[in-house]
Amino acid sequence: MKVDLNADLGESFGRYRLGLDEEVMKYITSANVATGWHAGDPLVMRKTVKLAKENGVAVGAHPGYPDLLGFGRRYMKLTYDEARNYILYQVGALYAFVRAEGIELQHVKPHGALYNALVKEEELARGVIEGIADFDKNLIFVTLSGSRPAEIAEEMGVKVAHEVFADRAYNPDGTLVPRSKPGAVIEDKEEIAERVISMVKDGGVRAINGEWVELKVDTICLHGDNPKAVEIAAHIRKVLEEEGVKIVPMKEIIR
């Protein structure tokens, strides 16, 4: 049994510092690097790509809405063409640094409000996936496990990684409970580990109302921007390995 561990990194910019990138990088196999629109800047992008290379971690682009002040967590209405070209632009920006460091770009994972909007808006999802395909159809599109965007990508011939979230509560329909609601973010490392094992070995997890939600798991998102991020990441990796699960980059799972 194999699974990838990913985290959103490179989200500092200018004088502002966010996340514990150097420490979290030790426990993951894929890094989602911010591409400058919701967070990140050229210096941070280069530094993060280099850090991933040094740690043997695969690199992916983490594009979002053009919303630096809102950290990409505010919804924006985009046309198909806007979505397609916004993604192409941001992926291309990160690829410049990936190429400069002599490594490969593995995947694309949309950020924040854009990630969530794809699940509800098929035209938006098609635009985003087309933008990925415009750049390189061999890139892996990371999206919410079992969601409509995953189906669309498969229909379009784009590789897909089904993603689950270690520290987020689920609705019965498999979507994430909004951060604004009580219980949306889980902070206890033992509870998080139990849920991750359930997802990987049992193929699902209990929703916030107690119902069972089936989930396909290719990659698990570990958030790197909370105070306990390093402790949680280390614990999850340890528990998975003790259960006999191999932790590998998603390119070794999605072929």
From Swiss-Prot:
Keywords: ATP-binding, Hydrolase, Nucleotide-binding
Enzyme type, top EC level: hydrolase
UniProt key word Hydrolase: yes
Highest taxon in the source lineage: Archaea
Biological-process GO terms, alphabetical: carbohydrate metabolic process
EC number(s) given by UniProt: 3.5.2.9
Subunit and partners: Forms a complex composed of PxpA, PxpB and PxpC.
Similarity section: Belongs to the LamB/PxpA family.
Database matches in HAMAP family: PxpA
Name of the molecule in the record: 5-oxoprolinase subunit A
Source species: Thermococcus kodakarensis (strain ATCC BAA-918 / JCM 12380 / KOD1)
Gene name per UniProt: pxpA
